[in-house]
UniProtKB/Swiss-Prot annotation:
Role this protein plays: Catalyzes the decarboxylation of four acetate groups of uroporphyrinogen-III to yield coproporphyrinogen-III.
Pathway: Porphyrin-containing compound metabolism; protoporphyrin-IX biosynthesis; coproporphyrinogen-III from 5-aminolevulinate: step 4/4
This protein's name: Uroporphyrinogen decarboxylase
Binding positions (substrate): 21-25, 40, 71, 148, 203, 316
Species this chain originates from: Campylobacter jejuni subsp. jejuni serotype O:2 (strain ATCC 700819 / NCTC 11168)
Coiled coil ranges: none
Amino acid sequence: MIFIDACFKKPTPYTPIWMMRQAGRYLPEYMEVRKQAGDFLSLCKDYKKASEVSLQPIDILDVDAAIIFSDILVVPLEMGMNLRFEKGEGPVFGNPISTLEDLEKLDDQNAHKKLNYVYDALKLTREKLSQNKALIGFCGSPWTIATYMIEGSGSKNYAKCKKMLYQNPELLHKILNKLTQVLKLYLEEQIKAGANAIQIFDSWASALEYDKFFEFSFNYMLEISNFIKSKYPNIPVILFPKGISGYLDRIDGNFDVFGVDWSTPLDLARDKLSHKYTLQGNMEPCRLYDKNAIKEGVEKILKTMQNKAHIFNLGHGILPDIPVENAKYFIKLVQESSAK
């Protein structure tokens, strides 16, 4: 698999490419299946439909890897939190965590056993996927998941989380530790079900100041990665902490690929990290609105990463109103322009 070879810094015939949120709303085929499922969470829980939408970008765009269709918040859902998706405001937890008693009500022993719909979707997708295409499993970082569990929804300033961080750091560490243990088992089951690689999404990394990022986020991601790498050395682990271009000097540990977001200068990440890790990224997602902007972005990134281990991706998820034709153009352009 070209994608796995690139993760491990092996030579590849061209630069492999996939897109975050590639199974998503910009595809009419996805919207059709989502409509059949009824709502977003029902789609996540219907393993046949989740597998179908995971495979759509392979069939339509010919990307080099599929990522399983799911959501980072199915983990706290199966730990016993009350999750719903509100139109216009995204995920909402009806019972956010603010005390140790709230945390102790959550089931960390059996949560990973209740996520069979994810493992079944992985098994089915791996069966249907061509042998040369990789299948990526994933989870959210403990910190990013915790922000939703504590805030009760998405947040502009993470005030409840940060209040806990400064007033009661022991409680926040207990929440993060509990999540970390569940996520280790969850990812292990994903690997057993057929995932060829794992990505940990730390979408809200940039909400933390420098030292606190390493204490409350990065160290927990490393604990998960160390667990995976010790048991499954042939499974690459990708970390994607978004928005931390100022923190790159301290990024170190046992993982394989570092995801670079679009706000981080790629040459900066290359100079600081490419001797240790394959870099993944980092085209500005809005470039996909315009073919000239796509061409300019692709050329610049390929030039920056010339002779370095690289997986092409967007620097965040593809947006819902991107024309499919532009996405196809983008994928093909990367694969053809980077061909050795």
